[in-house]
Amino acid sequence: MDHEHVREVDPEVADALAGERDRQEQTLAMIASENHVSEAVLEAQGSVLTNKYAEGYPGERYYAGCEYADEVETLAIDRAKELWGADHVNVQPHSGTQANQAVYYAVLDPGDKILSLDLNHGGHLSHGHPANFTGQIYEVEQYEVDADTGYIDYEGLREAAEEFEPDIVVSGYSAYPRTVDWEEIQAAADAVDAYHLADIAHITGLVAAGVHPSPVGVADFVTGSTHKTIRAGRGGIVMCDEEFADDIDKAVFPGGQGGPLMHNIAGKAVGFKEALDPSFDEYAQNVVDNAEVLAETLQDHGFSLVSGGTDNHLVLVDLRDSHPDLPGGDAADALAAANIVLNGNTVPGETRSPFNPSGIRVGTAGVTTRGFDADVMEEVGDLIHRVVDNVDSDDVIYEVGERVVELCDEHPLYE
């Protein structure tokens, strides 16, 4: 990955690419929505398929010369069906948000009702936030997690559904560290004759590997992104029963997108094949095991965790008890200076600004891809504690940063 052709044409971009390569090699990617793809996926996404316009679907294109585009997209679809057990799969969405958009376009009219989890409680912008198109086109009501336990309040969700009578109930979250009971949410949706969209963007890989229960076959629609825990490059995916297949396909194209990004679909195909290898199941289990070790280590250092722990790839830390004067954004900045990259995050009962909230969200998918095990994760938890306890100490931040570089050198990404 020396980008020799880029350097000949545009040294400034080549320098930025080289800098980003070095940054990824020398820092811990602990933003829960980030991961590292293989060199095979990188190569597929940088292939000549970027040149090909392929509006339509395999066998039904609007342009000639799509025989290899058809082959690649069909491989991606078939592999996705095998991974998740879905009847119908659309691999063309450019992102998880656009996958959600396709579902809304397929079954909702402007002004219809969405019931979803509040963003401060772990939801997502594309589930109805006022700043997002969903909050501007549809009527939105939101449910919450239980204030005492941090778990989804399923009873409150059912009551909200009965009172609000939504057209669609959205499950699946961006900052919820516990197992989701898809059947419980489906029952709430069924009781009010609503559709159920399960957004598994964060846990696509965990679901594929069987370390988290699957909503496929339970929810009417399942969406996800392909670059978090599945390691198939940037993009989105929609899964559904055959009865909704035509509506979903039309909502993706021509409803919300034009030509698909065939180079990204090639990356999806390659990443899905990698995920079908038995070694991926071991990886996904290690992601969860590492998150559990990290959670226990942080708790031992006195940190409060939303829900008291984790069942998946992320740990959500509420700093208000242990560090009441330290906003999550400031903690994240100090950790980034020490080469530990994560993000400030809102927490249930948020009292600060979303731009500098009360929590930090820590993910283990990226560091598990490096090969970190339980012992290393315990040390990472110790390092996070050192920095958060000493955000104003340049010496501590430097020392932790040096140790992080050593850990990265011991577990390189791309050799």
From Swiss-Prot:
<feature type="binding site">
    <location>
        <position position="119"/>
    </location>
    <ligand>
        <name>(6S)-5,6,7,8-tetrahydrofolate</name>
    </ligand>
</feature>
<keyword id="KW-0963">Cytoplasm</keyword>
<dbReference type="InterPro" id="IPR015421">
    <property type="entry name" value="PyrdxlP-dep_Trfase_major"/>
</dbReference>
<keyword id="KW-0554">One-carbon metabolism</keyword>
<dbReference type="InterPro" id="IPR015422">
    <property type="entry name" value="PyrdxlP-dep_Trfase_small"/>
</dbReference>
<dbReference type="GO" id="GO:0004372">
    <property type="term" value="F:glycine hydroxymethyltransferase activity"/>
</dbReference>
<dbReference type="Pfam" id="PF00464">
    <property type="entry name" value="SHMT"/>
</dbReference>
<feature type="modified residue" description="N6-(pyridoxal phosphate)lysine">
    <location>
        <position position="228"/>
    </location>
</feature>
<dbReference type="GO" id="GO:0019264">
    <property type="term" value="P:glycine biosynthetic process from serine"/>
</dbReference>
<keyword id="KW-0808">Transferase</keyword>
<protein>
    <recommendedName>
        <fullName>Serine hydroxymethyltransferase</fullName>
        <ecNumber>2.1.2.1</ecNumber>
    </recommendedName>
</protein>
<comment type="pathway">
    <text>One-carbon metabolism; tetrahydrofolate interconversion.</text>
</comment>
<dbReference type="GO" id="GO:0035999">
    <property type="term" value="P:tetrahydrofolate interconversion"/>
</dbReference>
<feature type="site" description="Plays an important role in substrate specificity">
    <location>
        <position position="227"/>
    </location>
</feature>
<dbReference type="InterPro" id="IPR015424">
    <property type="entry name" value="PyrdxlP-dep_Trfase"/>
</dbReference>
<feature type="binding site">
    <location>
        <begin position="123"/>
        <end position="125"/>
    </location>
    <ligand>
        <name>(6S)-5,6,7,8-tetrahydrofolate</name>
    </ligand>
</feature>
<keyword id="KW-0663">Pyridoxal phosphate</keyword>
<comment type="function">
    <text>Catalyzes the reversible interconversion of serine and glycine with tetrahydrofolate (THF) serving as the one-carbon carrier. Also exhibits THF-independent aldolase activity toward beta-hydroxyamino acids, producing glycine and aldehydes, via a retro-aldol mechanism.</text>
</comment>
<dbReference type="InterPro" id="IPR049943">
    <property type="entry name" value="Ser_HO-MeTrfase-like"/>
</dbReference>
<dbReference type="InterPro" id="IPR019798">
    <property type="entry name" value="Ser_HO-MeTrfase_PLP_BS"/>
</dbReference>
<dbReference type="InterPro" id="IPR039429">
    <property type="entry name" value="SHMT-like_dom"/>
</dbReference>
<comment type="pathway">
    <text>Amino-acid biosynthesis; glycine biosynthesis; glycine from L-serine: step 1/1.</text>
</comment>
<dbReference type="InterPro" id="IPR001085">
    <property type="entry name" value="Ser_HO-MeTrfase"/>
</dbReference>
<feature type="binding site">
    <location>
        <begin position="353"/>
        <end position="355"/>
    </location>
    <ligand>
        <name>(6S)-5,6,7,8-tetrahydrofolate</name>
    </ligand>
</feature>
<comment type="subunit">
    <text>Homodimer.</text>
</comment>
<comment type="similarity">
    <text>Belongs to the SHMT family.</text>
</comment>
<dbReference type="GO" id="GO:0005737">
    <property type="term" value="C:cytoplasm"/>
</dbReference>
<dbReference type="GO" id="GO:0030170">
    <property type="term" value="F:pyridoxal phosphate binding"/>
</dbReference>
<keyword id="KW-0028">Amino-acid biosynthesis</keyword>
